[in-house]
Amino acid sequence: MVTLSADVEDAALVAAVIYHESRFDPNAVSSLGARGLMQIMEDTGQWIAEKLNEEEGYTFDLLFNPETNIRFGTWYLGYLSRRFDGDIVKMAAGYHAGQGNVDAWLQNPENSSDGYTLERIPTDDTRQYVQRVVNAYEIYIRHYYAPQPTQEPAEEGA
């Protein structure tokens, strides 16, 4: 199982989510109305603003601002990380389908044999989303964070 720290300071996961949510387009709007780089829905944005004590100046249009969108999105990923013990599969499923759906899936023995491990995601779109995010995350980790081989200095006279 791939896990993540509770603070979601993992740029690889954030990049994987942004890539699959908006293809790095800060002005993206989904067919359901989600906005910005991390495709945050209106109700979720309002809820996050309240949790961050920023509801007074918050408007849905602020989610087109990359800094605000990433701050809100990474806060939400951190929340999901704490809620789902850093399990990236459950975090990605929760980000895409909602944490309540993940909770319901975990309670169904067809999806989880132990009530903790999400072995089956019953909706195609969320299952595919999770697979794509986890694959991108692993690629980013290998490409950007894996130790690079060091080159031995050439011997003199060689």
Regions found by a protein language model. Name each.
Residues M1-A158:
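Catalytic glycan-binding domains that act on GlcNAc-containing polysaccharides
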